[in-house]
Every structure is written in C-alpha cells, then in structure tokens.
A protein has these predicted regions:
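Alpha-carbonic anhydrase
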Residues: 1-262
Length: 262
C-alpha cells in the first residue's frame, strides 16, 4: 500500500483491520475475529514450502489469455464465489490488475475445467517457497471457475533482466487507493507474465490472506520470470514493503508435479 500495511475485511458490517506489522500480523489473524478462525485452525493453508515432488501426474494446464484493457488499482477488493459463498476479499496486496468478466476472454483450463481470470497481484517477498528458497516477489493470478471453484496460479519473480510487461505496470501505478483506473490506450496480456516453461506444481490450499478460506486449487509454476531490481523496488514501495504470509504446515496434503507438455 502507499500509506501503510493495514487492511480490512467486512465482518458483519464491521471493518476488521489486519496487516503485516504491529499487533495485526499474520500470526495473529486467527484471533482478530471468529471470521478469520481458519487462519489459525485450517489444515490446508497457504502458502507452503514446495520441498518434494510427491506425485508425478500428466500435464493439465493451458491458458488462453488475450490482450485486455489495463485496469489497475491499489488496495482493491476482489469478489469471489468460493464453494457457493459470495465474498469480497481484500487481499492486502496493494497493487492489482482487474479483468472484466464480459467477454470472458482471459481464461485458463485446468484439469479439464475452465476458469476466468479475475485479477492478479503481487507479494514481496514470495509467499510460496521452493526447497526453502524465497524469491524477491511472487505474482498470484486469481481465477474463478464454475460452482464456486477458485484456482490460483503462482509465478515466482527473480531479479534479472527488466520485464517489459511489469514495466507497463510500474509506469502506471495508481496514486489513489481503492479506485480502479483504466489506463487509456494501454492493454496487457497476462500471457506475457507467464514463464516460457509450463511445468508446474499443484496442491490444495487456501487464500493467503483473511479469511484464509480453503478449497482452492493452487498451481505454482516451476520456472520463474525476471524483473529488474529497480522494478521490484518500485512495486515494493507501492505495496508498502513486505506483504507475505509465512509458509504453513503441509499436513497430509500431496504435492503433484507436472512436466512440460511434449
């Protein structure tokens, strides 16, 4: 965020503040309100540390992303239908890009099911880890499916060459919180923010922010994309610094790995 890290979610018409600093840090989310109880008691929480390939499965991911108008906002809300429950999620991510649902062109197909891209946002440092390794940043692409299904694609971002698609974003960072801005004459294609390799890890998980609802399909791409240190620094500044939840216990979940399609 531009002006700090406090966030809020509607809880019975009461704004419940949560964040990443002070007495409302992730470790305390589950105690802030009963609506956030899963943050403390859930058994399928995200993020996780991807430490092993438990099961190798056939590849089941494809995307049909297309260029779309650039709608960017800071500290915005995301409407989701999760297992039949309509909810408005403020993910505490600071910078997000929204995608309109008509026409539903920004799509993926995962395990035979279609999902529509709702928004993508940034976390820094990365929330998911790979064999204990953290990355400077991670992008989450949030997709809505039928019958209350939600799928999130996580893409690690490492420091390296400047990223032209991310440059579009840093050049148009909003200066006012909570309002979507359509950048006139600018379009963005989410496919430009995906790695060239299509291998991925898959596991069941949750929202990484309150209310930490479970039942999400998580896909984390095996390859990272790059952004320049300057691009990462500008996005971190816009987000107000760190906005990452610590990794959560895997418990009895399986992690599957799918190699790139031939």
């Amino acid at each position: 965020m531009l002006a700090g890290q406090d966030k809020s979610v509607n809880d019975s018409a009461v704004k419940v503040k949560w964040g990443y600093k002070g007495d409302i840090v992730p470790e305390r989310w589950g105690k802030l309100t009963p609506a956030f109880a899963l943050c403390a008691t859930g058994k399928m929480q995200s993020p996780i540390d991807i430490t092993q390939k438990i099961q190798i499965v056939p590849h089941g991911l494809s995307w049909q992303y297309q260029s779309a108008p650039m709608i960017i906002m800071d500290n915005g809300d995301t409407p989701l239908n999760l297992d039949g429950h309509q909810m408005i999620i403020n993910e505490g991510h600071g910078v997000q890009l929204n995608f309109k649902d008509s026409p539903p062109r920004e799509m993926i197909t995962f395990l035979g099911n279609p999902y529509r891209l709702v928004e993508f946002h940034f976390h820094s440092p990365s929330e998911n880890r790979w064999h204990g390794q953290s990355f400077p940043m991670e992008m989450h692409f949030v997709h809505q499916g039928k019958a209350g299904k939600v799928a999130v694609i996580g893409v690690f971002v490492k420091a390296g060459e400047a990223n032209p698609a991310i440059q579009q974003i840093v050049e148009n960072l909003p200066k006012v919180e909570g309002r979507p801005f359509t950048i006139k004459g600018k379009r963005i294609n989410p496919a430009d923010l995906m790695p060239h390799g299509k291998a991925y890890y898959h596991f069941k998980g949750s929202l990484t922010t309150p209310p930490c609802s479970e039942g999400l399909q998580w896909v984390v791409m095996a390859d990272a994309i790059t952004a320049s240190p300057a691009q990462i620094a500008l996005l971190r500044k816009a987000m107000g610094g760190d906005n990452a939840r610590a990794v959560q216990p895997l418990n009895h979940r399986q992690i599957s790995f799918s190699a790139e399609e031939n």
